[in-house]
């Protein structure tokens, strides 16, 4: 089969022929129809996170395709079913986090395209218990980004503890942020979009954001405190440490900041203001299997639609270069029919 393989951090991926995997007990083989390209994939090939993958490996964790082989003991899915291969490849199932419904915090988890080979290949091996069931009504290309970008922001919004009618800030209207705006509106929230690009803010407005702020020429905290009295929650998807710092000041008393983006560096936190204003700061990483299925179902219901551009696997290195330069609008999806 054809696959994009990374042999050395920071180098180009090589398109090469590798063996089609064989499923073991509890595993399935999925023939890819589509795979989203995520910023996490870029971190994987650069090797710039503290916990690194081990080359050679195949990145990718937003894969959609049809099951072609089923391993021993798999009974809830079958050959021909369309499934999604997401970031969470597997977890131990018996630690405190797994037993409490927080398998995304399992210290023994494996991750697609990082600790195990991922979806930048014509066939991918998956753990049958951790794939998402793709609703029949949706297109594989359009649904692929939900497997990471979608579930990540959906879970992040849930972590803000906001309720219908509350205000939520979405900071960073890129691949994740434009989906976050839609999920937030579907959840009954009022959206204030913050970015430094007028085109992205115009897009957020088109998607239904009630307030937009360009943080490049306006102090977003001062503006939002004046216009809406501060937000009940803020979800930061931007890859800028400054955005996290700014978001804290956009909250009203009792507000919650949820961190989704993963830029390098730190951001300052005023102990006095955090205590006095009852502010909560949370990190949120992807989502559980339940979060994944809920986010897929919301997209299938037409409440959320990623802006996607389809390209062939052979373009992967060029895609990563555009990603480095911030030149990608929405999400890029690998189309395995191209």
Swiss-Prot record:
Pfam families for the chain: ADH_N, ADH_zinc_N
Noted pH dependence of activity: Optimum pH is 7.4 and 6.0 for the oxidation of ethanol and reduction of acetone, respectively.
Name of the gene: adh
Phylogenetic lineage: Bacteria, Pseudomonadati, Pseudomonadota, Gammaproteobacteria, Moraxellales
EC number from the UniProt entry: 1.1.1.1
Residues reported to bind Zn(2+) 2: 92, 95, 98, 106
Reactions accelerated catalytically: a primary alcohol + NAD(+) = an aldehyde + NADH + H(+); a secondary alcohol + NAD(+) = a ketone + NADH + H(+); ethanol + NAD(+) = acetaldehyde + NADH + H(+); 1-propanol + NAD(+) = propanal + NADH + H(+)
Keyword Endoplasmic reticulum among record annotations: no
The species this protein was found in: Moraxella sp. (strain TAE123)
Amino acids binding Zn(2+) 1: 38, 61-62, 148
Protein name per UniProt: Alcohol dehydrogenase
């Amino acid at each position: 089969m054809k696959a994009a393989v990374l042999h050395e951090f920071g180098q180009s991926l090589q398109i090469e022929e590798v063996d089609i995997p064989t499923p073991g007990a509890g595993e399935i083989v999925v023939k890819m129809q589509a795979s989203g390209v995520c910023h996490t994939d870029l971190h994987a090939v650069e090797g710039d996170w503290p916990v690194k993958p081990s080359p050679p490996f195949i990145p990718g964790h937003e894969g959609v395709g049809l099951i072609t082989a089923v391993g021993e003991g798999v009974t809830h899915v079958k050959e021909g079913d369309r499934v999604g291969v997401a970031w969470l490849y597997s977890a131990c199932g018996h630690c405190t986090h797994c037993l409490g419904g927080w398998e995304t915090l399992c210290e023994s988890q494996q991750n697609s395209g990082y600790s195990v080979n991922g979806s930048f290949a014509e066939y991918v091996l998956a753990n049958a218990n951790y794939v998402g069931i793709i609703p029949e009504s949706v297109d594989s290309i359009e649904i692929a980004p939900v497997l990471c970008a979608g579930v990540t922001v959906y879970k992040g919004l849930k972590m803000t503890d906001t309720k219908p009618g509350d205000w939520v800030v979405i900071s960073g209207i890129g691949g994740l942020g434009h989906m976050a705006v839609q999920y937030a509106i579907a959840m009954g929230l009022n959206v204030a979009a913050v970015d430094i690009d007028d085109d992205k803010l115009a897009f957020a407005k088109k998607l239904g954001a009630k307030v937009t702020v360009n943080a490049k020429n306006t102090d977003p905290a001062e503006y939002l405190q004046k216009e809406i009295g501060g937000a009940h929650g803020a979800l930061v998807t931007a890859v800028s440490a400054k955005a996290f710092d700014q978001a804290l000041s956009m909250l009203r008393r009792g507000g919650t900041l949820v961190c989704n983006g993963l830029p390098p560096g730190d951001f300052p936190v005023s102990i006095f203001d955090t205590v006095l204003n009852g502010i909560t700061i949370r990190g949120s990483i992807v989502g559980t299997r339940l979060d994944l299925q809920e986010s897929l179902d919301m997209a299938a219901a037409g409440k959320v639609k990623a802006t996607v551009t389809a390209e062939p696997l052979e373009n992967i290195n060029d895609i990563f270069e555009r990603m480095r330069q911030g030149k990608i609008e929405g999400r890029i999806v690998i189309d395995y029919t191209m």
